[in-house]
Amino acid sequence: MCCFLLVSVLLATTLTDVASAQRWRQTSGGGKDRWDGLLDPLDADLRRDIIRYGELAQATSDALIGDPASPFAGASRYAPDAFLRKVRASDPDAYRVTRFVYATSSVRLPDAFMPRPAPSAGAAWSGESNWMGYVAVAADGVAANAGRRDIVVAWRGTKRAVEWANDLDITLVPADGVVGPGPGWTQPSVHRGFLSVYTSKSFSSPFNKLSAREQVLAEITRLLRAYKNENCSITITGHSLGAALSTLNAIDIVANGYNVRGSSRVPVPVTAIALASPRVGDDQFKRAFDSTPNLSLLRVRNAPDIVPTILPSAFFKDVGAELLVDTRRSPYLKNPAGPAQWHNLECYLHAVAGTQGAGDGAGFSLVVDRDLALVNKEVDALRDEYQVPAAWWVEKNKGMVQNASGRWVLQDHEEGNLAM
């Protein structure tokens, strides 16, 4: 009898694990239908997943020092240790940051892409590099519950996207080294600026002797080796510019075999959650992306946001599947609003939490209980009756502290914030 009960328990556990794994493959777009039937109406598990990864992307914005008066403009305010706790992530212990990522560019970009210290700020931490995100890995408990070890790459976006959107050129260049020609497509081309941020290096900068691409790929390789005996997944996420970098990063990992480990040669699935993403590449890039196995991308687009469509569709093509949301349907937000609110990531996540479909008659209901105050972190979007000040996410006293002599000095970062 005891043996029978033990076998029954083991069988039930195995069936539960299998069902959980199958469900995860479905919500990560890994099934043959790639989110078909899960987007309208939005599946409950997928809704929570989008918000989870969106919050990991939001952490990059929350930590960025953007004030050009600071010598540390363009750097992270916090060190990797306890990073998600410092940015007040909703589940700060679910992932552990293992590496910061830095980028530079060999071509001229809009100033908003990479904030840098003003000449009057004094000795700058770097004149060439910017902190561009991080790599993290799921904690033991989270991995055990999920049945897999999730590796996340979170790419930083820009705080002033509506300013750079109209200053963005439309130059396409071959995506050499990232993705090449294949069965059914010729050499893909991608946006020159996005590719430059992803692949540029500078031997004069200690932060970019390796490109952002090389830093991320090296860390993914290291983590896959560290967890070689576990089921793993790779999730890439970002908002705005970060979403464009996520798109490049995701196909790069799969096209060049960085998701294949050991003698088993079994590929690790790669999923990108791209929020408010501009288009990245041409029709050949689209063919390559949408034809590559073990690669899925979900674009989340707010209907009135101009950034996802700013690059002309005659030259640039959307990739992956699309989840369309509309912040104008929320009864909690000011209406009319403007481009800054429509593009803001917290407003996006609010829309994901409440969307009831893309149809004309679809309503809005916050089925995920996200704090309304988050909407006003960086913008003035929440209706006045909720009594939440606009753009309230600021460092106390803007980073000014009183030293031992009683004088006020700028101390807007913690020790170790320039870790690699």
From Swiss-Prot:
Its main location: secreted. It is found in: Secreted. Glycans are attached at N231, N294, N403. Its EC number is 3.1.1.-. It holds the Pfam family Lipase_3. The active site is at S240, D305, H343. GO terms for molecular function: phospholipase A1 activity. Keywords: Coiled coil, Glycoprotein, Hydrolase, Lipid degradation, Lipid metabolism, Secreted, Signal. One of its GO terms (biological process) is lipid catabolic process. Residues 1-21 form the signal peptide. GO terms for cellular component: extracellular region. It comes from the Eukaryota. Acylhydrolase that catalyzes the hydrolysis of phospholipids at the sn-1 position. This is Phospholipase A1-II 3. It comes from Oryza sativa subsp. indica (Rice). The lineage of its organism: Eukaryota, Viridiplantae, Streptophyta, Embryophyta, Tracheophyta.
